[in-house]
Amino acid sequence: MPSKIFVKGARENNLKNIDVEIPRDALTVITGLSGSGKSSLAFDTIYAEGQRRYVESLSSYARMFLGQKEKPDVDYIEGLSPAISIDQKTTSQNPRSTVGTVTEVYDYLRLLWARVGTPHCPNCGKEIRQQSIDQIIDQLMALGEGTRVQIMAPVIRGKKGEHVKIFEDARRSGYVRVRADGNMYDLSEEISLEKNKKHNIEVVIDRLILRPDVVHRLTDSCETAAALSGGLILANILPDDRDILFSQNYACEDCGVSIEELTPRMFSFNNPFGACPTCTGLGTQLKVDPDLVIPNKSVSLLDGAICASGWNNVRGDGISRMYFDALSKKYHFSLRDPVEKLPKEVMDVILYGTKGEKLELQYDQPRGKGVLYQAFEGVIPNLERRYKETQSDGVREELEACMSECPCPTCGGKRLRRESLAVTVGDLSISDYCEKSVVDALDFVDQLTLTDQQMRIGERILKEIKNRLGFLRSVGLEYLTLSRASASLSGGEAQRIRLATQIGSSLMGVLYILDEPSIGLHQRDNDKLLATLKRLRDLGNTLIVVEHDEDTMRAADYLIDIGPGAGAHGGQVVAAGTPQEVMANPNSLTGQYLSGKKKIEVPKTRRAGNGSFLTVRGAQENNLKDLDVSVPLGTFTCVTGVSGSGKSSLVNEIIYKKLGADLNRMKVHPGRCKAIEGEEFLDKVICIDQSPIGRTPRSNPATYTNLFNDIRDLFASTPDAKARGYGPGRFSFNVRGGRCEACSGDGQLKIEMHFLPDIYVPCEVCKGKRYNRETLEVRYKGKSIADVLEMTVEEALEFFRDLPKLEAKLRTLSEVGLGYIRLGQSSTTLSGGEAQRVKLATELSKRSTGRTIYILDEPTTGLHTDDVKKLLEVLQRLVDAGNTVLVIEHNLDVIKCADYLLDLGPEGGSGGGTLVTCGTPEAVAACGASYTGQYLKKMLR
């Protein structure tokens, strides 16, 4: 086996025909400026080729489902192993996915609870024991004389297949009827079941009417049913077709409640045998929220206080107005009064209806006048009914804007049915155990006391649970609970969970490619992560990590610096070798920062702010412990703390959502707090995150920044365009008229290949230019609209230098370090850091009011130290204009440049949620109790 991976002639995206050697069974870090080509090399070339070769070895039928990747633009790659990509874009959005299910810990927990769990009665809580035939007979006879009963044997419960043999065996044994999936069949007829669906099948043993003289016959029938089904007896009570399940295995002596033998599927919320029947295992239900139906209580009904689909036209003369006129007349209130001044009884009637009491509705229409007598359904029941009845995704989406998730009333958010929640191990249900953090869950397992028999059964299961929980702790995720929804995890957390899962799999000879695993991780936990990466390497694997973190780069066996610039100015190997060799290379920008020759300077002064504060009182969201904090306005404030300390809960859930609801009229549910003071000093809140600036290839930097509108206006003002009667719309590739209709303005056509990846080919008509011939004939300074879209920001800045409006927007894009991107570059090809800087440039180009608060969550994700320097310059400019910048960050270069710090902690999860210290970076560095301060002290020397 070769000792290196050889990449020859890589040309994917902006890579300039580069050759790279990567040592096998080593930790290699690829670094460079944002947009320099790191991901193009690691993911789009090496991973894509490794994955493609693996998928190519499968059958054509399997390839159709796996979505084969096309061959990357590279001459050849030697020494490749099967590749596993662990990036930040694969966080599951499935509401059924949790930390426990993703790490497979929950699979072992289900097995543990099924094998050594103690069942209890869900009604009285008493421990359940096996039920004898005599007890079953007594319960059936208690139904009363004359009751008609069918005794059935449940032979198949929730299993796929046609089950032909089951029917044949029942027929040979002399049985006449079976019930399959709730339908009764005669065994003399042909019974056909779908092979790929789960089925329930019961054999009818006997049909009888309960009387004292049938006890012996009933006993025989029950014994036969139990023997046939393995201890289960199903009594079908006629004529109301009600089923009662009895088990020889477990039943409550007092309540008579039976449960089947404990199996792992009983504890799965993704299986109908374990999931709560009300919420089907989601743990939550969407309910219409009165606060979202009427978000602004200071507005009157007549002025549109009700912001719900179908209820916006109270001012008109439709059916809504008729109802509200009748309500105001009957309950004596004015439609012009603000909602907050209406009595509670009136609001209850408006929201929940008249409960069947009829109103006098007067109508006056062209067809005549009259009176109708109808009950008022109520706004909330009306919205809930329409949500259940609609078949339209659009209508459902509209209605969901007025709904919020709340815990399921049946299971209380625990996802499982009552019988499953009544099974305990060490006095805890499986749901209660999953509410514990990883570190508490480990302590519980270590202290668990079992009988000798239970220990023999559960020993191996407990070992697997401990191992997986230990791996989660080793990657700095000890604060997460096993019940935490995967969709709520940050990109860094999700990536480290997948990393922990891979360690648990103990694979050897694999190529792992990771994308910034240190994101969201406090400096304190970085050593744990590095130890984990080295452990994965020492198992006999090759690791390629795209990373900007200095500690990770220093710990690497091999370092590759891609650059020298970004975009068209990048795509070359600037330096490669050990970290020491890269530091000694004068051409490497990364090496200069690593060696200390270049660094981000600490500001000479700190702003004190404008004298006003935004104060949060009694913050209690998630793990926040009745927290009071103040953000000085007119400053660059950074919220710090170890992972899981409550930073996102404070900033994103409380501050952003509360200000968004009050200042921006957003329909959101702010996190729990007693009050927020100081909103009157702000006029809007803007969250600048790393989400894409558009979801389709049609979106690009020019359209997002509104630069394209100005460019289209410019082309429409040319003499040629005026002579032809072309307006700005002619130069849009999104509407008919000027665009190429052969490709609908996409510039390319998608060819479906079925067993191969889809191919995108340039449109033969417009040659990829998006516009028709007539539109392209209109030119400004000799360039067509398509030529302008192909320009980089730098080229466009020179081209439009005599047009102040265009020049100003282009200059801000250049100042945030995006001079290399093309104006028409598809937004889907931009990295998270690039998308964030496009948003920042858009904000910078707007006229500042000086009363805006900008919120950023880890803005340094994907940014090189040199990019961080540019980002800080932009953020400082926003603050210099009188605005407030509030940032969640772990990057010490950003933290040391802030005016004010709020350090949360001291630990993550239940050990966090308090304010450790606050003040200038120097004040925080002087606090011995602050983990952030300990690392910050070294940076301020």
Residue ranges, per PLM feature:
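Conserved phosphate-binding elements of NTP-dependent enzyme cores
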Residues: 1-941
